[in-house]
Amino acid sequence: MFELKTVALFVVTAIAEIVGCYLPYLWLRQSGSIWLLLPAALSLALFAWLLSLHPEASGRVYAAYGGIYVAVALGWLWLVDGIKPTNWDVAGVVFTFIGMGIIMFAPRA
């Protein structure tokens, strides 16, 4: 159960990070309102706070989180940008999940 909570927290964290970066992109590249920067800053603050909720050392958390981030970013690519991930994209996610699993679940001395 702990692992499922951890992965769910990583997913929410990734969404907060992506939204926090996507909104300034809309402002800078898509002629969005400068007011998009306010929710972007709040989203990035939420992202940082969510990362602090994990009991592991921060470097390990960031490394393991990276695997979930890659998967969520490809989901964003598909759902928001309307671009279907390629088989190579999916293979990349599988490899990042393998690395994430090793980092998260390896025995600790």
Swiss-Prot record:
Keywords: Cell inner membrane, Cell membrane, Membrane, Transmembrane, Transmembrane helix. GO terms for cellular component: plasma membrane. It is a multi-pass membrane protein. It holds the Pfam family UPF0060. It comes from the Bacteria. The chain crosses the membrane at residues 7-27, 33-53, 63-83, 87-107. Disulfide bonds: none annotated. It is found in: Cell inner membrane. PANTHER family: UPF0060 MEMBRANE PROTEIN YNFA (PTHR36116:SF1). Belongs to the UPF0060 family. This is UPF0060 membrane protein HEAR0108. It comes from Herminiimonas arsenicoxydans.
